[in-house]
Amino acid sequence: MIEFIQKKLFEFQDLKYKEFHSKLMPTINQKSIIGVRVPVLRKFAKEVFKEYSIEDLKPFLKNLPHKYYEENNIHAFLIEQINDFELCFFELENFLPFIDNWATCDMFCPKVFKKVAKKKPEEILLPLIKKWISSNEIYTVRFGIGILMRFFLDEKFDSSYLDLVSSINSNEYYINMMRAWFFATALTKQYEATLPIIENNILDLWTHNKTIQKAIESYRISADTKNYLRKLKK
């Protein structure tokens, strides 16, 4: 299974895309990038998941860390397809510590999470998010913030979720960038609840300013609000 997937990935290789995409991935060894576009990877992962059983896929899923960046992305997209929550969580927990870049971290969300989110996400997803956010692994923390942002800033919102992310104390760029993304998104969806975080300087300086920058870039925020946010930059 491992050799089969690697062989197919090289068949999909796009050298111009490899050159472009490599520049966006400073945290990983450039030699590990084959150069396969995400839509191609996602389509291939769906085909593999449909054709093979989880048992068939286990040699690949257990082969961590993977040799190639695109193998990580295939792994993520395979996890995304698993419909059984417990099995999905098991495979996700095994995989998260091996994520070594922002792109793999951000490009997938298990479909079963979406089903859970429609029922009782506070009972099932929220404890997992809190666990991930307290991790020592950069991209596990980032993943947790991303899932919180995806499922808990709309009708399931509670102001305590803002405190959960604001209380993260990290010097890691890829964690703080996700924190800024979270708060910028929160400003577009829960403005009244989120604004005091900015007005009262709750965040560290870098995340504070990056949040404002990203919010100002959003088309979902009015011109008047953007002008006010500009005045809050430090």
Feature-to-residue mapping (PLM):
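Alpha-helical scaffold domains
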Residues: 1-234
